[in-house]
Design a protein with these regions (language model features):
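Short linear motifs at protein or domain termini
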Residues: 1-96, 210-216
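Short helix-capping and inter-helix turn/linker motifs at the boundaries of alpha-helical repeat units
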Residues: 5, 104, 169-173
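Residue-level recognition of short, well-ordered coil/turn positions
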Residues: 22, 57, 121, 189-190
């Protein structure tokens, strides 16, 4: 495994903190804070912050620092509904060329998720990321993979709300839709696989809408 660079370590650390809800919407991060937190020089911190801005997680505010981008309910819904379009299209494209090895890898990823019962937001979100990005990668669209990765990264700004609410209401899928997608692919039932993939993506939308209505 290739050794993680300092920039990558800082990026991952900040991204993990946003995902876990340690840094919330509109919080301001400064270069000096991050230098102290990660014990590195200014250069990797500045590079990581710039990349987080490019990925839509932070916004650079001159003379203040870097603000965690606020996310609106409409933006959440737009991202999730666009993911449905992208991921279902990718699955239908890859379906004719899926191999037994591909499906076995998907099952391994899905079962690893369902077997883990820890309630750490970042770890659960990373497992979810691994399943969706691997599944989409099977259609061999490199540009689409990069776009999906960026969309999922942008979801980190609100995903802690989903997990904390779903765990409290005992409503988190814990990977069951991922298992259902793999089962359907093994049966060569593309329509059923797409149905469960859509349910998995939109489960976040439904939970966020429920949480929003409760807080109104």
């Amino acid at each position: 495994m290739q050794k993680e660079t300092l920039k990558e370590r800082v990026y991952r650390g900040i991204y993990e903190s946003v995902t876990n809800g340690e840094y919330k919407s509109n919080d301001i991060l400064t270069e000096n804070q991050m230098i102290e937190k990660f014990g590195v020089s200014k250069s990797p911190v500045r590079e990581a912050l710039a990349e987080l801005c490019k990925d839509g997680i932070l916004t650079n505010i001159p003379r203040m620092g870097y603000q965690v981008r606020a996310v609106t309910l409409k933006e959440i819904i737009d991202i999730l509904e666009f993911r449905v379009d992208v991921e279902l299209g990718g699955l239908r494209k890859s379906f004719p060329i899926l191999t037994e090895e591909n499906i076995a890898m998907l099952r391994q990823i899905a079962e690893r998720h369902s077997a883990d019962v820890d309630r750490v937001v970042f770890k659960n979100w990373q497992r979810n990321y691994e399943f969706h990005t691997y599944l989409y990668s099977l259609n061999n669209n490199v540009y689409g993979c990069e776009a999906l990765q960026q969309m999922i990264h942008q979801c980190s700004r609100y995903i802690s709300q989903y997990f904390l609410s779903a765990w409290q209401r005992k409503n988190e899928s814990n990977g069951r839709y991922h298992i259902a997608v793999v089962d359907a692919l093994e049966r060569r039932n593309i329509d059923e696989a797409c149905m469960y993939l859509e349910k998995d993506i939109l489960a976040v939308k439904e939970e966020i809408l429920t949480l929003h209505s409760m807080n109104m």
